[in-house]
Amino acid sequence: MNVNFDDFQPVTGELPASVHMIGIGGAGMSGIARILLARGIRVTGSDVKESRAVVGLRAMGATIAIGHDRTNLELAGEGELPDAVVISFAAIPKTNPELAGAHELDIPVLKRSDVLALLMQDSKALLIAGTHGKTSTTSMTVAALQAAGLDPSFAVGGLMSKAGVNAHQGSGDVFVAEADESDASLLTYQPEVAVITNIEPDHLDFFGDDETYYAVFDAFAERIKDGGHLVICAEDPHAAALGERAVERGINVLAYGGEEALAKHPTLPVGAVLHGWTPVDGGARVEATVGSTSVRFELHQPGRHMALNALAAMVGGDCVGADLGRMARGLGEFTGVRRRFDYHGSIGEGPFVGARIYDDYAHHPTEVSAVLGAARELVTEAGRGKVIAVFQPHLYSRTRNFADEFAAALSLADKAVLLDVFGAREEPLPGVDGALIANKMTIPVTYEPHFTSVPARVREIAEPHDVILTIGAGSVTMLADEIVRELSGDNDEQVES
């Protein structure tokens, strides 16, 4: 084992009265900042650029500087240092001047996950974990509980489309959040209910091997409070195996999935059964049993995986006392999460009439397969068009480790455009680029390493009524609207990666 899980213990204690957050505009950090501000904590922070998140936090009372500088530690006033500095574990290098200054001044440094644990410690924590689907399932859970009148606090890894926010301090006693496994930080939490959607090797740059990655979820299950529940998807073999081990250890387990999958695991107590799932109007009609109650609702989102995520939300909500009928109505009104099969536009006239453009955060082969499967449903339902994947690999290590799997997943599309790797926190690796995947694919593919040329490459291969997806966790999201403009004939503006 390359990671010592004993180094990750549940975090409890008092919230600091003031914090300085480095990288405050990030998806996870900005959500924590919103809740801290709502609780009356003094918040300062810094980020590399202005953003909607930064503007919104300033409006709530945060003092935020653009650019990183040691003097930012005194944004609250000259000589007034924060009680703690908060960082997102993977994103902030040790050479950051504010982080280095905090160490020199003996200011405690907390990870984002530490602060989230402190925020949740007096609530019923309903946490969503798993390799894929965390943000969608967390957002669905929030929507379901809100419809049931519980007003939960929540912290989500993306912006909920309807609410336009990623976090909220609620009046209820339930706190819904994602439990991120990428750096084992989920082990700092003590959930009342833990949902695990699936388990598949990822983040091997941190864990080192598959077995250590699997083991972090077993350790997470051990963090569940006495009398709490572990909710797992029986359709995922590793999640189901974890559920079976948890049953043997005396943990309360509830499984969800289709009838066939549940029948393969007879020792797993059943929380929900998916009886029917029918694509309709770009979404799906769902028929299921949750506990002993039959429910029917329609989702706005395509893909069977989204129906399973909805069941996870209902089982988790049932564990904290939410009304099933009201949750089902809430799921029917759920409009999605930005960057999760996020609709950007369609072409109304011209040579590409009827083409639809979506954007998705998928950055693992299984996620790519799921999103392309959902896109296939749309063209099948329409009876015309093809699926075009515009994919930007994320991280050099992940591209190297999963090149074959990415090639197979992307080959579920009809055509593809491959960008170069979005390295994020990593340095380039020799021989690792978008072509590494493109050369292994079995469908027509264009490798385009020049970011601003991608919309033109899409135009060369697009046809009427195609479903076109920009896919990846990096800057590829900026191209969705550019492709809409390119295919509409309004391509005067360009973006830079």
Predicted regions, residues:
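ATP-dependent carboxylate-amine ligase
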Residues: 1-65, 81-83, 139, 218, ...
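Conserved RecA-like helicase motor-core motifs
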Residues: 44-46, 149-156, 254-258, 446
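Acidic-glycine-rich active-site phosphate/pyrophosphate-binding loop
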Residues: 275-295
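BRCT (BRCA1 C-terminal) domain core and associated BRCT-interaction motifs
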Residues: 68-84
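Phosphate-binding loop of NTP-binding sites
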Residues: 10, 35-38, 58, 73-77, ...
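Conserved SAM/SAH-binding loop
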Residues: 67-71, 115, 451
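Glycine/charged-rich beta-loop-alpha catalytic/anionic-binding loops adjacent to active sites
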Residues: 122-124, 290-299, 346-357
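N-terminal Rossmann-like NAD(P) cofactor-binding module of classical short-chain dehydrogenase/reductase
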Residues: 86, 195, 469
